[in-house]
Amino acid sequence: MQVILLDKIANLGGLGDQVVVKSGFARNFLFPQGKAVPATKANIETFDARRAELEAKIADQLVAAQARADKLEALAEVTLVSKAGDEGKLFGSIGTRDIADAISAVGVEVAKSEVRLPLGTIRETGEFDVSIAVHSEVTATIKVIVIAEA
């Protein structure tokens, strides 16, 4: 199915690209989320008329994401307290939700889907660098310090 993308989508394309995708992906994901429209003549003409408006909207989103990333970088570090054994092994683990909640408690709203843990959940005490993907093009790195509960 031929579609016109209304947003940048990883591994697919950017604004205005006409791509061929499977019809189920288009009907179940792209169309409901407003990320694409079918590539009909009428939609192509409508898109060409709205292109500047959509590009301005995406630029505004990028500026807002950069501002959030700057706030996150200003935080520098977040400390989490968890129960741990003698050798620093945690009883349980610290995942994306725990990190997102801790950052949000400090004052910068972060969704758990934005937190990137490349090595999986944190299972020991120490300092860890965690990436926060605030936008597809903007990421911020924050230091997470995990200490044992006294």
From Swiss-Prot:
Keyword RNA-binding: yes
SUPFAM superfamilies for this protein: L9 N-domain-like (SSF55658), Ribosomal protein L9 C-domain (SSF55653)
One GO location term (cellular component): ribosome
Keywords: Ribonucleoprotein, Ribosomal protein, RNA-binding, rRNA-binding
Molecular-function annotations in GO: rRNA binding; structural constituent of ribosome
Coiled coil: none
GO biological process per UniProt: translation
Domain of life where this protein originates: Bacteria
Record-linked InterPro entries: Ribosomal_bL9 (IPR000244), Ribosomal_bL9/RNase_H1_N (IPR009027), Ribosomal_bL9_bac/chp (IPR020594), Ribosomal_bL9_C (IPR020069), Ribosomal_bL9_C_sf (IPR036791), Ribosomal_bL9_N (IPR020070), Ribosomal_bL9_N_sf (IPR036935)
Family of this protein: Belongs to the bacterial ribosomal protein bL9 family.
Function of the protein: Binds to the 23S rRNA.
Matching PANTHER family: 50S RIBOSOMAL PROTEIN L9
Protein name as catalogued: Large ribosomal subunit protein bL9
Lineage: Bacteria, Pseudomonadati, Pseudomonadota, Gammaproteobacteria, Alteromonadales
